[in-house]
Amino acid sequence: RRATISAYVENEPGVLARVSGLFHRRQFNIESLTGGPTQNEGYSRITLVVEEPDPGIDQIQKQLEKLIPVIHVRELDRNPVARELIILKVDGEEPDKVQAITDMYDGEALDAGPETVTVQITGSEEKIDDAIDAFKQFNIREIARTGQAALARGAEETARVEERHT
């Protein structure tokens, strides 16, 4: 099954390498991995999307919790607040049509010239997949796509933010 896992970690060099190394050693497949600073200085949130059977997901959480810079790990419910970002570059021969598709996906043109147009779209994984399909008619030259960033819904905390005491 597909799971979104959030890890609240100390923001220090090598944390992502340790997390990805753990997945490599255990032969878990990461579908997407994003990370960045949080509102608390010195801490980051890593969001992982994995496709594993239930025992594998439980094992992932247990192994992540053992890593020293990891403070809290949890699987988000099946419907977290989640978004991805895509930047794509297409042929610029039909800029008005490219803009119409961009608008349809609530996107933004970032760069336009006589040869190419570069646009940005944010949204759910499904929306991003649909946008890619829509832009194929303009010969997609390049794509840069983030992984999923996610938080728990409502007032529920995504992660406990107290420091680990060892």
Segments the model singles out, each with a brief description of its role:
Residues 1-44, 49-166:
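Long, contiguous binding/interaction regions
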